[in-house]
Amino acid sequence: MEFKGYIKEKFPYPKVREPQKRMMLKIYECIKNKRNLIVEAPTGVGKTLGYLIPALYFAERRKRVLILTETIDQQVRIYEDLSSLRHNLKVAFLMGKSNFICKSKGGKANRLYCQLNKKCLYRPNKRPICYCGTKKQPVNLGDKVIYYCPYCTCEYQKAKIESILADIVVMNNSMFYYAKEDIEAKRDIDIIICDEAHKLESSIRNTSTIIINPELPINRLKYMAIHYAPNILKKRLDIGDENFWEIIEKYLTSRGINIDICKETIIFDGENLSSWKYKTELAVLGAILDAYYQINNIKNKILRFNENEEIDREELRFEIDNKALIAIELDFIHKKKLSDLYLLEFIENIKNLRYINENYVVYRSGNSLLCEPVFVSSHLKELYGNAVVIHCSATIGNLKMHALKTGLDKAEFLILESPFPKNRKKIIALKDGVDMKYERKDREKANKNLLKILEAINGNSLVLFKSFEDLDSFYKYLKREITKTNIKNKNIHVYEQGMDGKEAKELKERFEKIGGILLATGRFAEGVDIPGEALVGVVIDSLPFPVPTPLILREQKILEERFKIRGVRDAHWRAFLMTSFDRMARTLVQMIGRLIRTENDYGVVVIQDKRFADWVGRVMREKGYLKDNYEVMSLDMAIKYIPKFMSQFKN
């Protein structure tokens, strides 16, 4: 078989792992026969090379390949792995605009600014000679030709052109949503490979969600008002002053300014603002004040809705009548070299509410209005087009459910075994733990259970919580009680609410270096890779069932109604399994997967929430989410068992 010889030629290491070879051959077979495929390849299989070598094989035979993943770090790793394999293909790496510097205004690039800035000197166009005098390079797009200057064209546009011309394109899921049509301007995509595919559904849902948050544009209006205010007024303005807008209104009316017509008098020539009726700075202030009244009115309407209750689309009659506002914000961000267009984004999102269909659910969350798609499978089917689609992940869980939710009709499945020894990991479910369902949970008892488990592990441990409230409760208890225990390494590391990616990475590195106990929420756990004795215990406080938002309730209701129409028994239970349970199970599998990252790792996973021992673990096994076995023990049994188990492997 030609492809087997190709594997030997391309594989960069002395030996191909058997599961890895199975993965390559199955991907090859499915692409050749134009069949979609979902692969669950646990950590250690060598998943990345498992799909890159088939991708190269077909790309070298004139098939165009798109590789998707979730984060820029993962994109970089895939791009570097591709570069390390011998080939003569064009490979492109496309990130979102915010990762580039805008040459036109300085600062981070912005999608909306780029759309509005039609006269931008740094984008490709139909002129063959650049303003700098350089002869531009042509790009043939079917019956159309555009030209770009290799010296002046902005880096995003260069990356986009490279993606249009490339044989293999690497991008994240959000860019797939926004830019797939653009990169097919010259050639269609034949093969789509999605790595970390368990994140695809939520990524596309988040990208297509409309968020109406009046706080951001109102805050932007305040800073704009201070910027354009005359010096005598500027001295009286303070962002935190509750009379901020009243001061501006009194100032304008005292000078005979008709606030209602200011927005109609503004003229913007692309570079400067002016007014045909008033002094420019006063007309601009009047237009800003008018915009505040309109947006504040929308804010008050939003706050009148009950939180976390679905809103009828007929009640979403919002409108902003202020054409000058976009020009003023463009002028402001250009002068201040800012990147975000909060007002323009707000106006665009208000307009987008008109086009939502029955698939969207709208509700208030905090001060914001969320408009989320219930199902994203139809979005994804459109994006897939006629391509063969391959989904890969270490933890997909229920493959049939994943196929249904991500629009992969008639997909084939491949589940690979972990190459790591199973006897080095033990999953323990406490039968006398606390039932952590919100209205029943006993936080004090759960805290005591967690400390006893940590004392039994007596090694570097990660404790995962459903909420920061639970984390904080245990942190206070642990600080008070840890000195009374025999835990050798008493260092405590805490993942705090609001930490950004950089801070979370530093926390993880500090824990790896110093060791001890790391307290975090489930969100922190996904993607965290801590091999060796740096992590020998994962303790899960509570099962990560999601809060029943209007999105989940609507999804569950629709599915239940469909099951009843089809005469399916236990329709409510089936709908629950496909919604709340599915989200919980996929997250829990990710949590469990934090422990064993290499073949020499060992340790225990202890699930404190007794619902796992009572019924959740059994259902997860039956439905294919959990591939590992687990043992049900009492807390006393676990405390005796864990030290004996750990002693077999400790250095």
UniProtKB/Swiss-Prot annotation:
Cofactor notes: Binds 1 [4Fe-4S] cluster.
EC number assigned by the record: 5.6.2.3
Helicase C-terminal domain ranges (all copies): 449-638
SMART domains membership: DEXDc, HELICc2
Domain of life assignment: Archaea
GO BP annotations listed: nucleobase-containing compound metabolic process
Database matches in PROSITE patterns: HELICASE_ATP_BIND_1 (PS51192), HELICASE_ATP_BIND_2 (PS51193), HELICASE_CTER (PS51194)
Iron-sulfur is among the record's keywords: yes
Occurrences of domain Helicase ATP-binding (ranges): 6-255
Keywords: ATP-binding, DNA-binding, Helicase, Hydrolase, Iron, Iron-sulfur, Isomerase, Metal-binding, Nucleotide-binding
Cofactor(s) needed by this chain: [4Fe-4S] cluster
Reactions it catalyzes: Couples ATP hydrolysis with the unwinding of duplex DNA at the replication fork by translocating in the 5'-3' direction. This creates two antiparallel DNA single strands (ssDNA). The leading ssDNA polymer is the template for DNA polymerase III holoenzyme which synthesizes a continuous strand; ATP + H2O = ADP + phosphate + H(+)
Binding site for [4Fe-4S] cluster: 102, 149, 154
MF-aspect GO terms: ATP binding; ATP hydrolysis activity; DNA binding; DNA helicase activity; iron-sulfur cluster binding; metal ion binding
Sequence motif DEAH box, location on chain: 195-198
Binding site for ATP: 41-48
Protein family: Belongs to the helicase family. DinG subfamily.
Other remarks on this protein: The fourth ligand for the [4Fe-4S] cluster could be Cys-130; Cys-132 or Cys-152.
Function of the molecule: Might be a 5'-3' DNA helicase.
Protein name: Probable ATP-dependent helicase MJ0942
